[in-house]
Amino acid sequence: MSAASREERSGPPGSFAKRVLVTGGAGFIASHVIVSLVEDYPDYMIVNLDKLDYCASLKNLEPVSNKQNYKFIQGDICDSHFVKLLFEVEKIDIVLHFAAQTHVDLSFVRAFEFTYVNVYGTHVLVNAAYEAGVEKFIYVSTDEVYGGSLDQEFDESSPKQPTNPYASSKAAAECFVQSYWERYKFPVVITRSSNVYGPHQYPEKVIPKFISLLQHNRKCCIHGSGLQRRNFLYAADVVEAFLTVLTKGEPGEIYNIGTNFEMSVVQLAKELIQLIKETNSESETESWVDYVSDRPHNDMRYPMKSEKIHSLGWKPKVPWEEGIKKTVEWYRKNFHNWKNAEKALEPFPVQPPFM
């Protein structure tokens, strides 16, 4: 681990009550979690490990970048020697593993990369954490591992039936993580969350993409019919969910992190058009919609029960109307937080295949 790859602000490992490793910390959700951890737990050292892929931005961490209990290390979870050394040097107590390739559209054309990063990288990380004797390992998965459903609500015991390469890679990684609990009683916890939205999300995902397209006077590109429905959870709420799992989650358990708020993709587009373009008629709203060919597979719904995490004291609080207005305003000012953000606005990924 080179001196150039890290920010030396912390004291020796023993000077903090806990040392928490957050992988993918320059990404969307993890950066929100890091900011909360750094500010709410001043006696915890928060170590951010990120390789700074295209969707990451250290601007997400500016509120805490100079804090004494925060450290950034640039590195790759797929580098087993580096990861082992990191655990030895940093004396990590807790891991929150967010680092992943997450864009479903991209997974269809770069499936091998998703397998490599999401499955192999997770295996490298959980094995290193096990060998280091970490006291809790939280693996961040997705509701998409359940596959789609029109009416059946999934709970944590529902079978995994993923339908796209991204979801398949996350499901496979879950199996590796869970095996360390089954084999060694290594204290792992798995979370599966609904779609999360809010500031700092790279604009390849549906909500920031639609917002950014409209703010650049371009139409919302809808895959297929747009009748697919998604549950949307605001970033501040999901942060509270992860802090709840961190403090109250039981080893070996899985927790759904969901919301009852559900909306079709076409309705989402229309609401954003009315909010941003202030359209006055249905025809005027429709003029800002462009229907394009669908994904190779596009699940209709991911209905999910979240009573298990509710029993730990967490429920979403931020109303859609409040969350979406904050999000729209953030992108109005911060779209260029990523140097390649314009690429994300194309209907389909334009990056070359991984292999």
Curated annotation (Swiss-Prot):
Keyword Transcription regulation carried by entry: no
Cofactor(s) this protein cannot do without: NAD(+)
Keyword Transmembrane: no
Top-rank lineage group of the source organism: Eukaryota
Organism of provenance: Mus musculus
MF terms in GO: dTDP-glucose 4,6-dehydratase activity
Protein family membership: Belongs to the NAD(P)-dependent epimerase/dehydratase family. dTDP-glucose dehydratase subfamily.
EC supergroup of this enzyme: lyase
Alphabetized CDD domains for the sequence: dTDP_GD_SDR_e
Source taxonomy: Eukaryota, Metazoa, Chordata, Craniata, Vertebrata
Record-listed E.C. numbers: 4.2.1.46
Keywords, sorted A to Z: Lyase, NAD
Protein name: dTDP-D-glucose 4,6-dehydratase
Entry binding sites for substrate: T142
Residues annotated as catalytic: D143 (proton donor), E144 (proton acceptor), Y166 (proton acceptor)
Reactions catalysed: dTDP-alpha-D-glucose = dTDP-4-dehydro-6-deoxy-alpha-D-glucose + H2O
One of the GO BP terms on file: nucleotide-sugar metabolic process
Stored InterPro entries: dTDP_Gluc_deHydtase, NAD(P)-bd_dom, NAD(P)-bd_dom_sf
